């Protein structure tokens, strides 16, 4: 679960991290009043969406008068911001962050993730702030410095100092960076985060460090013990189909294609999308119904897939290991009958009770295309979309 920048900075303040004074506003009038509270300009106004690339899309602007703040708010509030990280529809803008502008001398990067390889929280710091860290990692990996947090002893000040020295900081900046490092690490661990980024972490003209931007991602599996973070959730930033799927413990990710995919198992789901693409098709989604697929969950999965107007065919690919294929067949038959599917449905069953499942599908009398192989199923669903 992602948080907005203004929410991240509210948490930063509680953990002693320096950030510009700012206010999240929902109306143009509030935005003007926020500027008055902050004091003399210039100010920075930022659209609050769960996506990067806001600046290039016009969602971040430095302004020197309150009329420009009002104009920015009137232009964006209630609209959608499209960036390279959103889909073509963009993300809705419901808040504008107004904050004091900062005189920047240099931009740095500081972030942390859970490294599954080392099973540690790993901090990353770089002198290449203000750009995507993925790009830095690909082109100049030597510019990324890391510090792994030992889960038994927790973050240590010496780790912050080591990173500060590697970034070329000196004097009071080392102490400031160490304080930011310790505060951010404590925030990460206490709040069950999966990702945190300060990009950029800037050195001001006065030589001080300031967290100019903030991105936090919470571990969804730990939200049950983070009630405050749960209250910060913004459903408007989430795909409605993905939210519906989460209620049924279905793993769903919307894509841009026209072939709906329903599969059990994440690996098989990715392989299914690959083979659809290989044969000239385009997946409309990733959907993993998991090992506990029931008739009810299969029905909901069909509803979610078909709620996407782009879907022209559905590919069901089930390997029966834990789950029995005949029970999946019952679920498919019930779902097709209940939902009223009016697009071709190609089903490939393999494994536990696959023959019985295939017989049930054949005897159902419904417009379901049975496939006996993965390659054949992919070819059939692509042909169905093309009307062949």
Swiss-Prot record:
GO terms for molecular function: ATP binding; magnesium ion binding; succinate-CoA ligase (ADP-forming) activity; succinate-CoA ligase (GDP-forming) activity. SUPFAM superfamilies: Glutathione synthetase ATP-binding domain-like (SSF56059), Succinyl-CoA synthetase domains (SSF52210). It holds the Pfam family Ligase_CoA. Residues 9-244 form the ATP-grasp domain. Substrate binds at residues 264, 321-323. One of its GO terms (cellular component) is succinate-CoA ligase complex. It is an enzyme of class 6 (ligase). Its EC number is 6.2.1.5. It comes from the Bacteria. ATP binds at residues 46, 53-55, 99, 102, 107. InterPro entries: ATP-grasp (IPR011761), ATP-grasp_succ-CoA_synth-type (IPR013650), ATP_grasp_subdomain_1 (IPR013815), Succ-CoA_synthase_bsu_CS (IPR017866), SUCC_ACL_C (IPR005811), Succ_CoA_ligase-like_bsu (IPR005809), Succinyl-CoA_synth-like (IPR016102). Mg(2+) binds at residues 199, 213. Coiled coil: none annotated. Pathway: Carbohydrate metabolism; tricarboxylic acid cycle; succinate from succinyl-CoA (ligase route): step 1/1. GO terms for biological process: succinyl-CoA metabolic process; tricarboxylic acid cycle. Keywords: ATP-binding, Ligase, Magnesium, Metal-binding, Nucleotide-binding, Tricarboxylic acid cycle. Its cofactor is Mg(2+). Heterotetramer of two alpha and two beta subunits. Succinyl-CoA synthetase functions in the citric acid cycle (TCA), coupling the hydrolysis of succinyl-CoA to the synthesis of either ATP or GTP and thus represents the only step of substrate-level phosphorylation in the TCA. The beta subunit provides nucleotide specificity of the enzyme and binds the substrate succinate, while the binding sites for coenzyme A and phosphate are found in the alpha subunit. This is Succinate--CoA ligase [ADP-forming] subunit beta. It comes from Pectobacterium carotovorum subsp. carotovorum (strain PC1).
